C-alpha cells in the first residue's frame, strides 16, 4: 500500500506539474492586439491542417458573419519561423481573421484552434482604442474684465478612459505646470469616448493674463495632444513718459511707453503746468491712441513746463503720469541749412558733402533728405535719398548716373523727433566724368596697292560713336596683320596710333602685302579708358618681293669651254608665293652707251641675240626654274638646262608657263628695218653702252688697255655683215633654228668675245595676273678673259696656293692679336666713370671687325664693312654668354660695347646746335635727333620755342612709346611741364637724384611738400600724396592748366612720378632685382591711354637708356625665350644718341637678363601668399619641389662681382676669426678706429648689411672671442649701436659665446661697459647696458635681446616661428624708436659665426618691412642680396624654407591681409 501510495502521489505531482506548465504556456501565448476604433484589424495564426476554428470568448465565430472575414492560405514550411527537421517540405496553413470597422464591443479574447491533430490553439486579446484628440475648446483668444469669472474648456476624444486619465490630463500656463491650476481644473465624462476638461476662475486679475494649454500626456510624460487658449484680463491703461525735449521755441517732443491693459488705447490726454502756476490744464490736442510720441505746440519761448499724460481705453482712464523734470522751450527754432559741394565724381557717380551742423544744433538733426535732378530748363528728379547724420560727417555718393551729364543737388536737414525738415540748400551743380564710349560707327577699312610705286597702304575711316558717354578726345587705332604666307608667319604689328578728335581717318603706309589686316577702332573719352571697339578687316593682295639680293657670278672653265656660274639668292616669299624664276643673259653691244631698266629691255631668243648684225643689246632667257626645283647654283653657257632629267624639266616648264598665263612669254623686240650699209645712223641702230666704264673694268677684270683692244675687235666683228638681205637673222651658230617657241628658253654657248650682263626675273601669281620683279643687272663679265677653272681634287698647285694664302692670313691675325694684347695691358684699368675712350685697340678692332650688322645699314662706319651682329641669345645660353664676355677683365663686353654706333648717316641734330637752344642742353654732347625729337607748341611764332632735349623712343614691337629726356634745368622746367601736358603724359620715371657727387643733376620740378602747389608757366602742380618703398618713391601730382579762353572747361590731370633712388650717374645698380621689380611696377600701371612714358635721369641717355633697353629686352625674353641685346641697344641709339652710356650699364643689361632668365618673377603678393608658398613646397611624385629647385639655383648663381677678403685673411687677424671660411668682405666690413701703438686694431669680423631701404641698417657679427670682446664693445660705441640681438648660448666651446659683460661694470681700453638690469620674457631675455667712451665722455644706452629658443644642433631651425616673430617685432621696433639720429646706429646681431641664425633674423626684418609697406614679399631676391654681402648667409634649404613659413605666420598673426582688404 505504501508503494502504491507513493506511486499515486508521484503521478499526481506529474499531472499537477503538467497542468501548471500548460497554464504557463497558455498564458504566455496570449497576444495583445491594439485596434483603432473605426479601422480594420487582422489576426493571424498557423496550422498543419486546414481545419481551424475562431472563437470570441466561448462563442464560435461564424464564417458568414458580416463583421468578420475568415480566410486560409497554404504556405511553405519554416515561413512561421519553426524548424523543419524532415528532409522534404510539407504544407502548413496561414489562418486570418479580419475584424471590420472595429468598435468598443469587439474587445475580448480571440482564439484560433486547430480541429484535428493535437488541437493546438493561439489566443489574441483585442483592445480597441481611440487616439486622444481635442475636438472643441474655448476660443483661442478670450477677454475678460478684471474681477470677472471665466471658464476654459477642452472637449477631448479618447478611449479607453480609466483611472490614469486624471493623471494624464493637465492645464499649463505659458508652457509651465502650476499646482494651483489642478485646483481649478475638473474632468467630466460625457460618454465612453468623450470627456470635458475645464479650468474655471471665479475672479480674474492681471496675474491671470497668459496662454493656457490643455494637454494630454502618455504614461511616460510625453505630450500627445494639446490646445492653447490665450486669456486677456482687461484693465485701465498705464502710461509713462520716457523722454521729453524742447524742439523749438514753442514745441516740445514727447515719447512714452504704454501698457494698454489688454484693450486698445482710444486717446491720450496731456495736461501741462507752466512753471510758477498752481494748476495743470489740458493741452488743446487729444492724441490718437495709436501714437507713442507727439509734438506739442503752442508753448511760450524760453519757458519751463511740467507735463502729465493719461491714457484711456474701453475700461476707463488710467492714472496720470508726470515727467519728473521740467521742460524749457528754446528761445528760437533750430534751423540748419547745409552748404553743399561736390567732392568727387566718376563716370556713373557723384559724391557730395556738406558742412556739419553747429554743436548746439546737432541734437536736433538726425538725418538729411537729398535730391538729385538732371539739369535742364525743367530739372528732372532722378533720385531722392535719406542719409543718417553721423559724427564723422561722411559724404554721400549718388550712383547709377548717366555719364558726362550735369546734375543739380539739394540737401536739407531733418529731425527724427519732429518728423520735419528745414529749408533746402542752394542748388549745387555736378557733372559725371566721361564713361566708356560705344563703338565708332561707319568703320571703313580699305587695303590699297599701288601698281606703279608698289606701295601698300590702308585707309581707315570712321564716324563718332552713337553714344559717346562723354566728350571724345581721341581714337585708339590698333592694326594687326596676319600674314597669308605659309613660309613666313611672323605677325605684322601691332601698330597702334592715337588720333585726336575731330579727325576721323588715318592712313597706314608701307604695310606688308599678302596680309590679312584687322583694325579695331575705339573712342577714348576724357576718362582715358578705351571705349567699345569697332572691328574691321581687309586683305592686302600679294606682291613681288621687297628686295632681290645680289646675284653673284663668275666665269669658269668647264671641259675647255667657258661657262658662267651663278649663285642665286634665296628670296623671301613673305609678300607672296614665288612660282617661277627666269634668268636673262644680256649680250652687250659695245656701241651702246647704257641699258634701259630690265623690265623695259626687249627680250629676244638666243639666236636673235647672237646675230652678228644686231646693233642693240638684247636679252634672252637662259634658264627658267620653278620654285619647286629652285637651286642656288646655276651654270650658264653649258648648253644644258639645270637638270638632265627630262621629266623634271617638263614639270618645271609647265609650272612656270602656267604661272605666266595671260602674259606674253617673251617681250618681242620691235622689227628693225636696216637700210643699206653706210646709211645706218647711230641714232637708229645703236643703244648707248654703259656709262660707268669703271663698272665694266671691274666686272670683266680688264685693264684700260685691254678694254680698248677688245672694243676694237668687237667693232670689226659687227662691221662684217654675213647676210645682205637680213643681217639680223645671222647667228653665231647657223645650225640652230632661227626661232622655235620650244626653244624660248635656251642656254646656248656664250660668245667669249662679248660682254655679258644679266638679271633675274621673279614671278608671283596674283589670282589672274602674273606679277614680275627684276633684279639689278649683274656685274659685266667678259668670258674671253682668264676664267677660274673648276679645280680637280688632284690639283696640288691649287691646294698649295690655298695653303700659302691661309698661312699669310693666320700670320696677320697673330700679329694683330699681339698688338691688341700689348695695348690692352697698357690701357688704364680705372676708366673715368664709364666714359668712352678710343684706344689703338679700338681702332684695330673696328678695322678688323667693322660693324657687321645687316639690320643697321644706316650706321656711320669706316669702309664698306657692315655692322657687328651679336645675334639673339637663348634664355638657356645667357649664363654662358655672360661668362664668355666676362673673361679677361670683361674683354668680350668691351669689344661688343665699342662696336655700338655713336653716329648715324640719317640722323641730324640741327635744332640742338642752334645758338638759341644751346642753353637748353644740360650737356653739350647730349643732343636730340631732329628726326625723333619731341616738338613743343610754338609760342608767339618763335620756332626755337618748340625745342626740348627729349626724343621719342619706341619699345619692344612698338607696343610702348617712351620719351627719353634730360633732367630739367631751372630754365627748362616750364618747357618740361609743357611737354608733359601737350603729350598727355601720365607716368614719369625719374632715375636721378637732385644732387649727386655734390653736383646738381636735376632741378626739382614739383612742389616742396605734400599738399603744396606751385605754378610752372601755365601749369599749376599740386603735390597730392607720396608713398615711399625701399627702392623708390611714388608721388601723385595733380596738374591743371590755366584756361586759354573764358568759358573753356578747366582740364585737370593726375600725374604719377616714380622716383628711383639708388642708381648713381654712369653706374649700374649693384643688384638687378630692384630695378627689375621697379620696371614691373611701372608696367603694372601702364596702359596706352596713359600716353608715352616719360623717362629721365640727368642727361637722359645712360640710366634712361638702360631702363628702356631692359624693359624691351625683358619683354622679348618672356615672349621669344631669347634676347638680342646688341641689336636692341643699336635700335635705341638710332632714336636718341648715346642711350646706354657706359660699359658698366651695358654689362648690367646682361646681368639683369641673366637674373630674370634664371629666376623669373619671384614676387609673392599677400592675398595669394599662403597658396603660392604652398604650391612652391608641394612635392611632385618624383623629384624636388619648386622651392628646392629655386634654392639650388640660388646656390649655383655665382656672384658676378669679385669681392676680396684680404684684410680678414691677414695672418695677424686670423686669431680674431672663429672660422677661416667666414671672413667679411673688404668692401662692407666694419672698420674700427685705429688704436695708437697697436697694429691691426681696425679689424673685427663684422659686416654692414643693407636693409629694406638699401641703407646699412644692420651689422652681422660673429660671437666675440675672449680676445675680441674689447673690439666688440668698441664697435658698439663707435657705430652708436642702441639695439643688440644675440642669437647664441652663453658658455665655453667652439659654438658657444663667452659672457662679454660683467655683473656690474668692466672697462676695455677706453670703453666702459656697465650692466644695468635684465628682464626675462617668454622667448628672449632683455638686458640694459650703459657703454661709455671715456675719451670723449659719451655714454650710450644699449639694449640687448638674447633669443632663447634656437635648437642647439648645427643647421637646425626653430620648429615654430612665434619666437622669432616676437624677437623681430620687439628688437626692430626698439631699433626704430631708439636709434641715434645723425648717424648710422645700425641694429647689430651676432651668432656663432655670424651666418645662419643672424641671417634669418635680418632677412625676417627686411621681409616684414617689405610686407607691411608693399603688401608683397620677394624672399628669393632678399636672400640673394643678403648672400652677396657676407659669406655663409641663408646657406641651407631648411633656413630658406623657414623664411617662407615664418612670413606666412607673421602675416596671419598680425592680420596684415585683413588690413589690406580694409
From Swiss-Prot:
Boundaries of every Ig-like C2-type domain copy: 29-125, 131-230
Keyword Transmembrane helix belongs to the record: yes
PANTHER family according to UniProt: RECEPTOR-TYPE TYROSINE-PROTEIN PHOSPHATASE, TYROSINE-PROTEIN PHOSPHATASE 69D
Gene3D superfamilies, per the entry: Immunoglobulins (2.60.40.10), Protein tyrosine phosphatase superfamily (3.90.190.10)
Active-site feature positions: 1097, 1391
Annotated membrane topology: Single-pass type I membrane protein
Chemical reaction(s) catalysed: O-phospho-L-tyrosyl-[protein] + H2O = L-tyrosyl-[protein] + phosphate
The enzyme's E.C. designation: 3.1.3.48
Organism: Drosophila melanogaster (Fruit fly)
Record Pfam families: fn3 (PF00041), Y_phosphatase (PF00102)
Locations listed in the record: Membrane
Keywords: Cell adhesion, Disulfide bond, Glycoprotein, Hydrolase, Immunoglobulin domain, Membrane, Protein phosphatase, Receptor, Repeat, Signal, Transmembrane, Transmembrane helix
A single Gene Ontology CC term: cell surface
Fibronectin type-III domain ranges (all copies): 237-332, 334-435, 439-547
Segments in the Extracellular topological domain: 29-805
S-S bonds: 45-112, 154-214
Family per record: Belongs to the protein-tyrosine phosphatase family. Receptor class subfamily.
Reported function: Possible cell adhesion receptor.
Residues with attached carbohydrate: 40, 58, 64, 85, 109, 119, 162, 191, 196, 209, 255, 288, 302, 429, 442, 451, 516, 613, 701, 755
Biological process, per Gene Ontology: axon guidance; cell adhesion; defasciculation of motor neuron axon; dendrite morphogenesis; fasciculation of sensory neuron axon; motor neuron axon guidance; neuron projection development; signal transduction
Protein name: Tyrosine-protein phosphatase 69D
MF GO annotations: protein tyrosine phosphatase activity; transmembrane receptor protein tyrosine phosphatase activity
The Tyrosine-protein phosphatase domain, residue ranges: 893-1156, 1187-1450
Amino acid at each position: 500500500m505504501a508503494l502504491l501510495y507513493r506511486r499515486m502521489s508521484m503521478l499526481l505531482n506529474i499531472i499537477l506539474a503538467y497542468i501548471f506548465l500548460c497554464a504557463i504556456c497558455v498564458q504566455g501565448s496570449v497576444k495583445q492586439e491594439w485596434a483603432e476604433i473605426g479601422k480594420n484589424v487582422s489576426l493571424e495564426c498557423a496550422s498543419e491542417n486546414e481545419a481551424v476554428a475562431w472563437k470570441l470568448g466561448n462563442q464560435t465565430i461564424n464564417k458568414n458573419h458580416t463583421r468578420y472575414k475568415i480566410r486560409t492560405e497554404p504556405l511553405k514550411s519554416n515561413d512561421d519561423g519553426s524548424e523543419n527537421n524532415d528532409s522534404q517540405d510539407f504544407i502548413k496553413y496561414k489562418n486570418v481573421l479580419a475584424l471590420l470597422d472595429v468598435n468598443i464591443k469587439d474587445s475580448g479574447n480571440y482564439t484560433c484552434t486547430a480541429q484535428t491533430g493535437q488541437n493546438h490553439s493561439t489566443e489574441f486579446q483585442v483592445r480597441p482604442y481611440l487616439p486622444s484628440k481635442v475636438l472643441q475648446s474655448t476660443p483661442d483668444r478670450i477677454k475678460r474684465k478684471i474681477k470677472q469669472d471665466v471658464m476654459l474648456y477642452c472637449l477631448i476624444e479618447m478611449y479607453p478612459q480609466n483611472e490614469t486619465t486624471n493623471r494624464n490630463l493637465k492645464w499649463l500656463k505659458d508652457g509651465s505646470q502650476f499646482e494651483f491650476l489642478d485646483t481649478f481644473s475638473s474632468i467630466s465624462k460625457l460618454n465612453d469616448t468623450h470627456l470635458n476638461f475645464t479650468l474655471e476662475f471665479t475672479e480674474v486679475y492681471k496675474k491671470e493674463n497668459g496662454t493656457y494649454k490643455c494637454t494630454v500626456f502618455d504614461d511616460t510624460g510625453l505630450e500627445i495632444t494639446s490646445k492653447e487658449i490665450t486669456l486677456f484680463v482687461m484693465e485701465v491703461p498705464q502710461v509713462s513718459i520716457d523722454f521729453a525735449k524742447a524742439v523749438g521755441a514753442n514745441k516740445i517732443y514727447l515719447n512714452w511707453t504704454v501698457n494698454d491693459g489688454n484693450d486698445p488705447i482710444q486717446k491720450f490726454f496731456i495736461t501741462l503746468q507752466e512753471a510758477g502756476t498752481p494748476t495743470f490744464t489740458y493741452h488743446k490736442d487729444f492724441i490718437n491712441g495709436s501714437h507713442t510720441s507727439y509734438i506739442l505746440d503752442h508753448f511760450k519761448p524760453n519757458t519751463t513746463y511740467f507735463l502729465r499724460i493719461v491714457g484711456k481705453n474701453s475700461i476707463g482712464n488710467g492714472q496720470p503720469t508726470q515727467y519728473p523734470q521740467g521742460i524749457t522751450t528754446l528761445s528760437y527754432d533750430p534751423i540748419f541749412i547745409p552748404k553743399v559741394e561736390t567732392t568727387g565724381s566718376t563716370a556713373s557717380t557723384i559724391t557730395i558733402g556738406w558742412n556739419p551742423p553747429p554743436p548746439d544744433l546737432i541734437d536736433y538733426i538726425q538725418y538729411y533728405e537729398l535730391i538729385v535732378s538732371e539739369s535742364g530748363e525743367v530739372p528732372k528728379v532722378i533720385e531722392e535719398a535719406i542719409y543718417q547724420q553721423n559724427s564723422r560727417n561722411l559724404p554721400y555718393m549718388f550712383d547709377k548716373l548717366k555719364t558726362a551729364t550735369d546734375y543739380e543737388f539739394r540737401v536739407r536737414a531733418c529731425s527724427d523727433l519732429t518728423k520735419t525738415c528745414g529749408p533746402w540748400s542752394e542748388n549745387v551743380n555736378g557733372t559725371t566724368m566721361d564713361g566708356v564710349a560705344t563703338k565708332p560707327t561707319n568703320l571703313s577699312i580699305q587695303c590699297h596697292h599701288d601698281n606703279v610705286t608698289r606701295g601698300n597702304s590702308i585707309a581707315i575711316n570712321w564716324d563718332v560713336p552713337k553714344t559717346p558717354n562723354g566728350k571724345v578726345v581721341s581714337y585708339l587705332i590698333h592694326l594687326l596683320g596676319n600674314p597669308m604666307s605659309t613660309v613666313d608667319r611672323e605677325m605684322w604689328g601691332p601698330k597702334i596710333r592715337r588720333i585726336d578728335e575731330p579727325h576721323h581717318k588715318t592712313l597706314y603706309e608701307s604695310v606688308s602685302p599678302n596680309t590679312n589686316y584687322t583694325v579695331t577702332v575705339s573712342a577714348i573719352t576724357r576718362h582715358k579708358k578705351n571705349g567699345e571697339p569697332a572691328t574691321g578687316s581687309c586683305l592686302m593682295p600679294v606682291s613681288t618681293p621687297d628686295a632681290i639680293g645680289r646675284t653673284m657670278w663668275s666665269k669658269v672653265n668647264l671641259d675647255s669651254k667657258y661657262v658662267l656660274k651663278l649663285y642665286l639668292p634665296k628670296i623671301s616669299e613673305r609678300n607672296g608665293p614665288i612660282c617661277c624664276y627666269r634668268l636673262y643673259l644680256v649680250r652687250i653691244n659695245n656701241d651702246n652707251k647704257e641699258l634701259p631698266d630690265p623690265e623695259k629691255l626687249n627680250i629676244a631668243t638666243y639666236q636673235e641675240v647672237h646675230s652678228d648684225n644686231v646693233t642693240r643689246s638684247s636679252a634672252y632667257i637662259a634658264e627658267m626654274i620653278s620654285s619647286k626645283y629652285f637651286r642656288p647654283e646655276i651654270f650658264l653657257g653649258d648648253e644644258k638646262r639645270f637638270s638632265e632629267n627630262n621629266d623634271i624639266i617638263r614639270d618645271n616648264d609647265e609650272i612656270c608657263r602656267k604661272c605666266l598665263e595671260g602674259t606674253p612669254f617673251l617681250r618681242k623686240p620691235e622689227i628693225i628695218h636696216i637700210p643699206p650699209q653706210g646709211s645706218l645712223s647711230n641714232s637708229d641702230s645703236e643703244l648707248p653702252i654703259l656709262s660707268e666704264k669703271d663698272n665694266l673694268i671691274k666686272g670683266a677684270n680688264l685693264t684700260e688697255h685691254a678694254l680698248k683692244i677688245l672694243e676694237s675687235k668687237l667693232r670689226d666683228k659687227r662691221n662684217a655683215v654675213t647676210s645682205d638681205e637680213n643681217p639680223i637673222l645671222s647667228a653665231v651658230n647657223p645650225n640652230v633654228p632661227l626661232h622655235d617657241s620650244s626653244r624660248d628658253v635656251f642656254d646656248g654657248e656664250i660668245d667669249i668675245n662679248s660682254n655679258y650682263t644679266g638679271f633675274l626675273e621673279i614671278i608671283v601669281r596674283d589670282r589672274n595676273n602674273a606679277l614680275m620683279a627684276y633684279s639689278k643687272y649683274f656685274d659685266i663679265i667678259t668670258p674671253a678673259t682668264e676664267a677660274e677653272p673648276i679645280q680637280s681634287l688632284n690639283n696640288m698647285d691649287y691646294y698649295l696656293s690655298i695653303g700659302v694664302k691661309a698661312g699669310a692670313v693666320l700670320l696677320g691675325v697673330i700679329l694683330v692679336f699681339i698688338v691688341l694684347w700689348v695695348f690692352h695691358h697698357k690701357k688704364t684699368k680705372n676708366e673715368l666713370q664709364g666714359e668712352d675712350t678710343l684706344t689703338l685697340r679700338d681702332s684695330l678692332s673696328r678695322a678688323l671687325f667693322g660693324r657687321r650688322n645687316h639690320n643697321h645699314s644706316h650706321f656711320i662706319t669706316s669702309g664698306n664693312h657692315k655692322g657687328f651682329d651679336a645675334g639673339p641669345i637663348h634664355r638657356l645660353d645667357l649664363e654662358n654668354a655672360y661668362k664668355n664676355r666676362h673673361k679677361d677683365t670683361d674683354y668680350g663686353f668691351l669689344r661688343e660695347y665699342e662696336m655700338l654706333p655713336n653716329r648715324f648717316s640719317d640722323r641730324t641734330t640741327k635744332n640742338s646746335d642752334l645758338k638759341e637752344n644751346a642753353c637748353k642742353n644740360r650737356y653739350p654732347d647730349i643732343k636730340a635727333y631732329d628726326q625723333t625729337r619731341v616738338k613743343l607748341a610754338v609760342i608767339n611764332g618763335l620756332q626755337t620755342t618748340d625745342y626740348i632735349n627729349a626724343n621719342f623712343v619706341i619699345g619692344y614691337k612698338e607696343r610702348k612709346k617712351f620719351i627719353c629726356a634730360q633732367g630739367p634745368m631751372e630754365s627748362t622746367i616750364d618747357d618740361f611741364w609743357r611737354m608733359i601736358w601737350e603729350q598727355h603724359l601720365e607716368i614719369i620715371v625719374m632715375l636721378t637724384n637732385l644732387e649727386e657727387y655734390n653736383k646738381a643733376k636735376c632741378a626739382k620740378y614739383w612742389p616742396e611738400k605734400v599738399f603744396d602747389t606751385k605754378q610752372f608757366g601755365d601749369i599749376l602742380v599740386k603735390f597730392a600724396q607720396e608713398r615711399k618703398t625701399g627702392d623708390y618713391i611714388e608721388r601723385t601730382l595733380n596738374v591743371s592748366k590755366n584756361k586759354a579762353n573764358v568759358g573753356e572747361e578747366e582740364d585737370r590731370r593726375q600725374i604719377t612720378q616714380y622716383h628711383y633712388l639708388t642708381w648713381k650717374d654712369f653706374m649700374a645698380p649693384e643688384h638687378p632685382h630692384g630695378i627689375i621689380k621697379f620696371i614691373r611696377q611701372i608696367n603694372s600701371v601702364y596702359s596706352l591711354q596713359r600716353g608715352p612714358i616719360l623717362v629721365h635721369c640727368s642727361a637722359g641717355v645712360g640710366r634712361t637708356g638702360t631702363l628702356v633697353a631692359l624693359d624691351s629686352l625683358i619683354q622679348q625674353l618672356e615672349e621669344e625665350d631669347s634676347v638680342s641685346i646688341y641689336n636692341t641697344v643699336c635700335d635705341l641709339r638710332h632714336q636718341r644718341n648715346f642711350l646706354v652710356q657706359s660699359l658698366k650699364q651695358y654689362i648690367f643689361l646682361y646681368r639683369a637678363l641673366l637674373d630674370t632668365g634664371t629666376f623669373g618673377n619671384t614676387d609673392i603678393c599677400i592675398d595669394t601668399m599662403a597658396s603660392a608658398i604652398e604650391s612652391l613646397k608641394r612635392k611632385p611624385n618624383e623629384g624636388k619641389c619648386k622651392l628646392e629647385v629655386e634654392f639650388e639655383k640660388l646656390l649655383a648663381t655665382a656672384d658676378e662681382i669679385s669681392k676680396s677678403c684680404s684684410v680678414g685673411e691677414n695672418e695677424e687677424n686670423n686669431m680674431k676669426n672663429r672660422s677661416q671660411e667666414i671672413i667679411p668682405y673688404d668692401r662692407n666690413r666694419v672698420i674700427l678706429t685705429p688704436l695708437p701703438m697697436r697694429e691691426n686694431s681696425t679689424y673685427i669680423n663684422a659686416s654692414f648689411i643693407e636693409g629694406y631701404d638699401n641703407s646699412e641698417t644692420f651689422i652681422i657679427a660673429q660671437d666675440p672671442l675672449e680676445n675680441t670682446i674689447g673690439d666688440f664693445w668698441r664697435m658698439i660705441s663707435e657705430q652708436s649701436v642702441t639695439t643688440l640681438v644675440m642669437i647664441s648660448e652663453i658658455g665655453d666651446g667652439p659654438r658657444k659665446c663667452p659672457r662679454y659683460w660683467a655683473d656690474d661694470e668692466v672697462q676695455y681700453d677706453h670703453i666702459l661697459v656697465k650692466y644695468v638690469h635684465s628682464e626675462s620674457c617668454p622667448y628672449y631675455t632683455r638686458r640694459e647696458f650703459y657703454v661709455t667712451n671715456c675719451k670723449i665722455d659719451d655714454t650710450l644706452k644699449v639694449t640687448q635681446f638674447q633669443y632663447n629658443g634656437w635648437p642647439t644642433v648645427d643647421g637646425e631651425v626653430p620648429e615654430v616661428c612665434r619666437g622669432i616673430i616676437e624677437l623681430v617685432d620687439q628688437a626692430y621696433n626698439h631699433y626704430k624708436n631708439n636709434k641715434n639720429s645723425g648717424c648710422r646706429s645700425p641694429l647689430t646681431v651676432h651668432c656663432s659665426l655670424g651666418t645662419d641664425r643672424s641671417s634669418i633674423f635680418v632677412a625676417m626684418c627686411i621681409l616684414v618691412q617689405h610686407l607691411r609697406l608693399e603688401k608683397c614679399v620677394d624672399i628669393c631676391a632678399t636672400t640673394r642680396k643678403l648672400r652677396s654681402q657676407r659669406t655663409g648667409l641663408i646657406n641651407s634649404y631648411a633656413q630658406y624654407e623657414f623664411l617662407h613659413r615664418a612670413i606666412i605666420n607673421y602675416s596671419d598673426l598680425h592680420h596684415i591681409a585683413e588690413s589690406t582688404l580694409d
